[in-house]
A protein has these predicted regions:
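Long, folded non-catalytic interaction modules
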Residues: 2-12, 17-238
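Short, solvent-exposed mixed-charge patches
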Residues: 242-245
Length: 245
């Protein structure tokens, strides 16, 4: 991809990230989203996994998808493939709270993971949250079907900012994720996409299980939609009979 086109994609992703409420670093920052454009998606994926395997499965625990999913990442024929890595961190300090596979290369087992401090006895909140550590995205330019670059950049934004199941059926949603599913109406991030990302980044991140975390995002989405319907936050007026003079 030509440098000016690559910069366009980077800028588009940054704008979408800011709109969602994500933090965006400036020039010279340590990037955690790596985007590669190639004419051979499977070949590039296999080479990356072979040479940087710990980057795809870095920790002992649920930081990424299964080995089978990693095989799909390497061998699928999709125009865009991605791999997200989420790392458990201690809520109050941000320190990594898991044993990393790379640590096992040290004779003494490497640094000891941070001891998680118990803040309170709440059953709703966890002392550990999962942060998106990095994402690898490969665009197979021979398979994108001439998708407009802006729409492609929005698609890449979505998989950069959220953990999207590559095999999810979203055909009943108005979403940029249907770009390569034969949906000619896709013109970029939809209102559904933007609202979902905004809810994802505004919801609390310390719920104590995946179901509770999903519910927190859903509540955030409902609140966002209500604010859009009533931007001034007006309360519904009481019935006539109950009004005071």
């Amino acid at each position: 991809m030509q440098p000016e086109l690559a910069q366009f994609v980077i800028d588009r992703i940054a704008v979408n990230a800011l709109d969602a409420g994500a933090d965006v670093g400036g020039p010279g920052c340590n990037p955690n989203v790596i985007i590669l454009a190639t004419s051979d998606g499977p070949g590039m994926a296999r080479r990356l996994v072979r040479e940087f395997r710990l980057g795809f499965r870095p920790a002992v625990g649920d930081t990424n998808l299964s080995r089978a999913a990693l095989g799909d990442f390497q061998n699928s024929g999709k125009p865009v493939r991605w791999w997200n890595v989420a790392i458990p961190v201690e809520v109050s300090s941000g320190e990594i709270a898991a044993r990393m596979y790379g640590d096992l290369l040290y004779p003494d087992g490497g640094p000891i993971p941070v001891v998680v401090r118990v803040r309170d006895g709440s059953r709703l909140r966890s002392n550990v949250r999962y942060d998106m550590a990095w994402t690898v995205i490969i665009i197979d330019m021979n398979r994108t079907g001439g998708a407009p670059l802006g729409v492609l950049a929005d698609y890449v934004s979505m998989v950069s900012l959220a953990q999207i199941d590559p095999n999810a059926d979203l055909s009943d949603q108005q979403t940029v994720m249907n770009l390569f599913e034969g949906d000619a109406t896709v013109r970029g991030l939809s209102s559904w996409d933007r609202d979902y990302l905004a809810a994802l980044y505004s919801a609390p991140t310390d719920r104590n299980n995946p179901g509770s975390q999903e519910a927190a995002v859903a509540r955030s989405l409902v609140t966002l939609r209500r604010m859009q319907d009533d931007p001034q936050g007006r309360q519904a007026e009481p019935p006539e009979a109950s009004r005071r003079p």
